[in-house]
């Protein structure tokens, strides 16, 4: 959401106000209340991720909508879709974005749910498809595949959460100096973002990969960008600790054996990572 907003700042003269978060990664609702009270008549849109794709922290969207009043509220629910209860009606948002690739569907297809009372400018002009918002012949196979993937319901949230809790408990037992980012907030079942003091995430990532364990240093949409996570910086990390963090993801096909294997290699990885950081 940040990149389109920043584009509007650079090219359309818009003003962007980034709402701070707490150390747990939850939106600072008091700040938002003050902002709306002071400048509500100037605000065109409030846009908040339903859950963060790096930490899994779930935002209080319904409360944001209440604070916003008549201001339109958009939520990017791509990460949350099928992973946690998600009701467009109950949240009360103006619009919600979803994507197929997060639920096992094809890349390049998604959905924008928008209240009928609102009209938005066309992204592409032409034949008038997609209610004249996005012209072009509809990709029927991808649409059908998206619907099938969303309906399959193969993701068992309770099972995945049990695996995550097993992983985090084992991790903290073997590496007591590590800490889980967003642990005090409501989180998605399958994401664990961990900081390992005294290490560098790039080194840890290579070591984990050599041990046949897949993890990441941040979101896939920023992969390959060697800079501290803006998410962790917003949560109060300095650049050093932000670059000492890894994201572990568990999915529908993850097993207890996967978790136990990852835990078995972590002590060696952390030890070697700290040694490399001291050179």
Predicted regions and their residues:
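Pyridoxal 5′-phosphate
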Residues: 1-279
């Amino acid at each position: 959401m940040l990149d389109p907003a920043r584009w509007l700042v650079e090219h359309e003269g818009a003003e962007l106000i980034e709402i701070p978060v707490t150390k747990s990664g939850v939106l600072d609702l008091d700040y938002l209340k003050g902002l709306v009270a002071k400048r509500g008549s100037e605000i065109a849109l409030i846009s908040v991720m339903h859950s963060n794709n790096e930490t899994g922290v779930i935002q209080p969207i319904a409360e944001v909508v209440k604070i916003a009043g008549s201001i339109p509220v958009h939520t990017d629910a791509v990460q949350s879709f099928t992973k946690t209860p998600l009701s467009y009606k109950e949240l009360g948002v103006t619009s919600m974005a979803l994507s197929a690739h997060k639920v096992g569907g094809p890349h390049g297809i998604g959905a924008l749910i928008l209240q009928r009372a609102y009209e938005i400018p066309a992204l592409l002009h032409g034949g008038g498809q997609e209610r004249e918002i996005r012209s072009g012949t509809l990709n029927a196979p991808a649409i059908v595949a998206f619907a099938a993937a969303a309906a399959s319901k193969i993701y068992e949230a309770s099972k995945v959460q049990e695996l995550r809790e097993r992983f985090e408990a084992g991790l903290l037992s073997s590496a007591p100096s590590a800490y889980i980012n967003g642990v005090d907030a409501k989180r998605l079942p399958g994401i664990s973002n961990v900081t390992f003091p005294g290490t560098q995430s790039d080194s840890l990532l290579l070591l984990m990969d050599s041990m046949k364990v897949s993890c990441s240093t941040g979101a896939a949409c920023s992969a390959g960008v060697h800079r501290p996570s803006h998410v962790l910086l917003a949560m109060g990390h300095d650049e050093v600790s932000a670059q000492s963090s890894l994201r572990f993801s568990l999915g529908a096909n993850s097993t207890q054996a996967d978790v136990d294997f990852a835990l078995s290699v972590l002590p060696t990885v952390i030890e070697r990572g700290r040694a490399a950081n001291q050179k």
